[in-house]
């Protein structure tokens, strides 16, 4: 329940404390769904990133967030962002969200930071488009097809966007079926 839920946060020992880069995933799942994908995969991704980042000295402070009660209405991330002082909020330069990134029948979605598809939700805060482009460049270099997905408010990037913090991230699909175009690109 949200009342008994907690967030778990960790951060790099190195890096500029005035330039914080955050990566997060939610810890909970719904009873009816496959918790291993939603969101064991996002949690594992952020944890592995933290383990790899421990081997380097990043220029920016890196904060890893494992959110409680996302499935109950983004409770953990909302409380975290709401509790930030203005000064602490200004130090967070970007937030990367990883929710359902290991679907067994995936589509490679990148959060659409600049509303480049021109449909659905508007662009994210300034800086979100740059995050989208970084992921697009990576996928292009790897010759992996990708598609934009709207910031529809259904995951923990929501409170950060509302606070004006640039956001980005990856997603491999949820309850929807693939379109015919997606099935051609990714199989299934």
Model-found features: residue ranges?
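Soluble metallo-hydrolase cores and metallopeptidase-like ectodomains found primarily
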Residues: 1-35, 48-51, 59
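His/Asp/Glu-rich mid-to-C-terminal helical/loop segments that flank catalytic regions of hydrolases
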Residues: 51, 62, 173-188
């Amino acid at each position: 329940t949200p009342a008994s839920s907690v967030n778990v946060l960790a951060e790099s020992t190195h890096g500029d404390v005035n330039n914080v880069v955050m990566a997060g995933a939610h810890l909970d799942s719904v009873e009816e769904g496959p918790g291993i994908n939603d969101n064991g995969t996002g949690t594992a991704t952020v944890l592995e990133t933290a383990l790899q980042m421990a081997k380097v000295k990043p220029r920016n402070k890196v904060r890893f967030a494992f959110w409680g009660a996302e499935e109950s209405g983004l409770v953990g991330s909302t409380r975290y962002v709401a509790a930030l002082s203005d000064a602490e909020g200004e130090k967070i330069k970007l937030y990367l969200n990883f929710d359902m990134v290991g679907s067994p029948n995936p589509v490679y979605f990148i959060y659409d930071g600049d509303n480049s598809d021109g449909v659905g939700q508007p662009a994210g805060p300034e800086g979100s488009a740059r995050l989208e482009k970084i992921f697009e460049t990576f996928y292009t270099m790897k010759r992996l097809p990708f598609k934009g997905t709207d910031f529809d408010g259904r995951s923990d990037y929501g409170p950060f966007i509302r606070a004006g913090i640039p956001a980005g991230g990856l997603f491999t699909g949820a309850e929807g079926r693939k379109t015919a175009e997606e099935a051609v690109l990714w199989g299934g």
